[in-house]
């Protein structure tokens, strides 16, 4: 509807961003890297229309953590590559320093979004915001409690998390 309205009003638009909840509103389905079949029954068709009919690209937000009911969470959990400390929204963050976590992350991103026609993704919250993350002193405390990453202490390497995730 937004894109159609912009086109009807002759307002220039090259890209539209859906920030979150394309996976659903339930926190347990957070960032499953799949479209909710109820709210997005045919994402490939919608994206195709955005491209061919409206000449607009689609960007989706993708997060480094996952709700407990998602396949990616279950796969990351089985591989033991999730930090123990939950974020402000209650999901757990992947140890993206671990090659196994990188592979799982990319496979879900590729299969769940890229193959549907999504043009780009916005890697949101790549500085994992743990509980009370809005307060710097609390963020530091929780970061130190996150434990060990594949390459060492989370407290020591957390600042490079965004860089590693974008690779």
Enumerate the language-model features and the residues they cover:
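Aromatic- and carboxylate-enriched substrate-binding clefts and catalytic-loop regions
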Residues: 12-167
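Carbohydrate-interacting/catalytic domains
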Residues: 1
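Ser/Thr/Asn(+Pro)-rich, low-complexity disordered segments
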Residues: 4, 8-9, 27
């Amino acid at each position: 509807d937004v894109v159609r309205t912009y086109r009807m009003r002759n307002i220039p638009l090259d890209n539209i961003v859906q920030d979150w909840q394309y996976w659903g509103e339930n926190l347990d389905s957070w960032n499953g890297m799949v479209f909710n079949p109820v709210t997005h029954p045919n994402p490939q068709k919608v994206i195709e229309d955005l491209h061919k009919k409206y000449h607009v690209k689609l960007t989706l937000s993708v997060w480094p953590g996952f709700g407990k009911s998602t396949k990616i969470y279950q796969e990351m959990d089985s591989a033991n590559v999730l930090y123990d400390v939950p974020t402000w929204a209650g999901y757990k963050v992947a140890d993206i320093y671990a090659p196994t976590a990188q592979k799982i992350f990319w496979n879900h991103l590729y299969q769940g979004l890229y193959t549907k026609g999504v043009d780009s993704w916005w890697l949101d919250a790549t500085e994992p915001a743990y509980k009370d993350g809005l307060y710097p002193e609390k963020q530091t405390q929780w970061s130190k409690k996150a434990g060990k990453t594949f390459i060492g202490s989370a407290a020591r390497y957390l600042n490079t998390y965004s860089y590693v995730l974008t690779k």
